[in-house]
Amino acid sequence: MPQVDPELFDRGQFQAELALKASPIAAFKKAIRLAGEVLDKRFRAGSDIRPLIEARAWLVDNILQQAWNQFDWGDQSGIALVAVGGYGRGELHPHSDIDLLILLGAAEHEQYRDAIERFLTLLWDIGLEVGQSVRTVDECAEQARADLTVITNLMESRTIAGPEALRQRMLEVTSTAHMWPSKEFFLAKRAELKARHHKYNDTEYNLEPNVKGSPGGLRDIQTVLWVARRQYGTLNLHALAGEGFLLESENELLASSQDFLWKVRYALHMLAGRAEDRLLFDHQRSIATLLGYSDENPKRAIEQFMQQYYRVVMSISQLCDLIIQHFEEVILADEESGSTQPLNARFRLHDGYIEATHPNVFKRTPFAMLEIFVLMAQHPEIKGVRADTVRLLREHRHLIDDTFRTDIRNTSLFIELFKCEIGIHRNLRRMNRYGILGRYLPEFGLIVGQMQHDLFHIYTVDAHTLNLIKHLRKLQYTPVSEKFPLASKLMGRLPKPELIYLAGLYHDIGKGRQGDHSEIGAVDAQKFCERHQLPAWDSRLIVWLVQNHLVMSTTAQRKDLSDPQVINDFALHVGDETRLDYLYVLTVADINATNPSLWNSWRASLLRQLYTETKRALRRGLENPLDREEQIRQTQSSALDILVREGTDPDDVEQLWAQLGDDYFLKHTAADVAWHTDAILQQPADGGPLVLIKETTQREFEGGTQIFIYAPDQHDFFAVTVAAMSQLNLNIHDARIITSSSQFTLDTYIVLDNDGGSIGDNPQRVKQIRDGLTEALRNPEDYPTIIQRRVPRQLKHFDFPPQVTILNDAQRPVTILEITAPDRPGLLARLGRIFLEFDLSLQNAKIATLGERVEDVFFITDADNQPLSDPQLCSRLQEAIVQQLQAGQGSDTSQTRVTF
């Protein structure tokens, strides 16, 4: 801490101002405000962070001493003002709590009551954010014995005013001789750390991390120092190095990492104007700029800053894990030496942990840096790596160079890991944590800590990749096989499961580089296969999977799967059933590893449908595609059989069907056609809109809720329908619009509730939906089609130009309208209003919400059911859509394309 800093606080000048004022409050406030401005100015100018937070603590020391001296304490031998917690360490950020202990020597302290109350009132009046307690020495001992937080705070203390002897008495009665011996304290702090990490999903890679509490945050460093203080009486990183728990290089890395997080936290407090430790989207751009990250693309600057953040917290996690494991080995060690068991000449087990047999193992036999992970996969009883061996790995990873990467012993060991029955994910994660994976695969090193500034990808690229491999492993286990039955079954019969793990490892490895990441990744995967001398068939499959890992999800979500041509084109692209099996499993794992909320029952159904129909096409032979007319005949024949069995007159059926057109029978199954037909024929002529609701499938974890509407066609039908569904809190995922020759509309919507599930067996909810839609369609003129809702906080920070593409389908008489835009409440209803204004008919729609953006595809025609052919009409349509999508946003540009 500075001994004196007149620019920050001049004692003489301050006391002179106090003497001139009737009330001290204004002088204190002015001093605090001016000092804060000085510190913020120094921060913006790039001053070192440590002197800044120490200077703020020094400032508060002076303010508190001056405030303390405003009151008559009489005999001061029995009272002291003590700083505890972070302030006790001499560290204060702009809005950190100032934790104070008013320490009393005896239980009888009535003489101080009035002065204490007036002192605390003054602190609040002058704007200090104070957390205070008033305790005697004995009360400190009593509460510290019962509360881990109290003993932790008291360990970090400084006397601000009053006799130091009181604090020394307090430290004596709360020492390890009286309570919380180091072993008990360590176990409690370790449990506290694990619980805190679990609160933040046990990952350093949250989209909006907490710089203090998240794994790898400042609290992890403090936990290590608290344990060290309890065990050794030391409370700084340099002293830890002196005790042998840290190398000097590790001490420097941990200190620089702490400084980086201090800068981020200081900036957060300064920008938020309050104690804010969450690195929210609201602040990420401003902090990136403040800390000097720049790019022509502001989004890229944020990603650069966050990648640095994630790499820093990963380093902190690694080093804190190492120190805590050292503590375990020292503090929890039994009296007698632990048992050892040899594994081979290079490694042995020590109390269940693997360790090197001598310090030069990795220097003499570098291949052991990969062998250790294979051994742990082959021996799942191994609990982990001994701390000294982790340090040896870190010290020798520089030996992993191009020669190492092409050594057949090393390439063979790496492939061997992927053939192990268990432990693949666990040991790849260890390799990444210890910095081995990124050294062995430099292309993987590029994606470590790399984030994408959106709500779709909730993990960094490396974390997502390892999550994907973890999900592939889970597909073999019963709990998830119930949720993913087809993927689990296929995973169990893949001829070479190691190939899907390798494809998963490389599927996103091209991200962050200029160009298509699938193509870049395929090139890297090809080089990997050649370096590891994989057979030609294996190499071709891995490269193909990397290159095409997005094709299946894109087809399922954006194409009309009822169109035989779509299925045939996809089957031609895939080529054979083996590739189809691998691609389906990889796609399921990829979606779930990207963001668990993306996986819903309807997406599961779409992928199953695409898989099943493609498999049929492949077995039928690609030279024998299913004919549209043949599919229509099959659907009608099967539906008629169902209806006749139920007693329906075939003539009535044929009369109705003659009005519906071919597309209706292509877009619906025979069971649905029979269900619709029976209900329509029983509907009274003046019965109003017919609204039917049922589940699309009885399979658990699949399907959605199908809403079928039959009513006289009207101009604003779609706009009113989607607005009503929005008000009913339904998310539309698919829409099929048919208009009969008798001018009735037959619309089918696939919807999910806000939680991503179908409506299910809920009669009250079904009635609410049916009544709400019926009322809206009976009185469309009274129904608002523009829904006003509050935009969620996170969505506000992802404002990008909408992309609108209009093109005519070469195979069908429709125009395809593709829209990518920020997700906003009521978006579909707004588009429905535009379709109404332009006299357009919607034939089909595929709706996908991916994090903060929507990717919607609409199949539209003009009023005569023809594709749009007027370029000026298309331009006006595009302009209207962009204006509507940009309403209330900051975007002023868009990307558009019109093709005929």
Curated annotation (Swiss-Prot):
SMART domains: HDc. The keyword Glycosyltransferase does not apply. It catalyses: [protein-PII]-L-tyrosine + UTP = [protein-PII]-uridylyl-L-tyrosine + diphosphate; [protein-PII]-uridylyl-L-tyrosine + H2O = [protein-PII]-L-tyrosine + UMP + H(+). Keywords: Hydrolase, Magnesium, Multifunctional enzyme, Nucleotidyltransferase, Repeat, Transferase. Transmembrane segments: none annotated. Its cofactor is Mg(2+). One of its GO terms (molecular function) is phosphoric diester hydrolase activity. It comes from the Bacteria. Its EC number is 2.7.7.59, 3.1.4.-. Modifies, by uridylylation and deuridylylation, the PII regulatory proteins (GlnB and homologs), in response to the nitrogen status of the cell that GlnD senses through the glutamine level. Under low glutamine levels, catalyzes the conversion of the PII proteins and UTP to PII-UMP and PPi, while under higher glutamine levels, GlnD hydrolyzes PII-UMP to PII and UMP (deuridylylation). Thus, controls uridylylation state and activity of the PII proteins, and plays an important role in the regulation of nitrogen assimilation and metabolism. This is Bifunctional uridylyltransferase/uridylyl-removing enzyme. Has four distinct domains: an N-terminal nucleotidyltransferase (NT) domain responsible for UTase activity, a central HD domain that encodes UR activity, and two C-terminal ACT domains that seem to have a role in glutamine sensing. Uridylyltransferase (UTase) activity is inhibited by glutamine, while glutamine activates uridylyl-removing (UR) activity. Residues 461-583 form the HD domain. It comes from Pseudomonas putida (strain ATCC 47054 / DSM 6125 / CFBP 8728 / NCIMB 11950 / KT2440). InterPro entries: ACT-like_dom_sf, ACT_dom, HD/PDEase_dom, HD_domain, NT_sf, PII_UdlTrfase/GS_AdlTrfase, Polymerase_NTP_transf_dom, UTase/UR. GO terms for biological process: regulation of nitrogen utilization. Belongs to the GlnD family. Residues 706-784, 816-900 form the ACT domain.
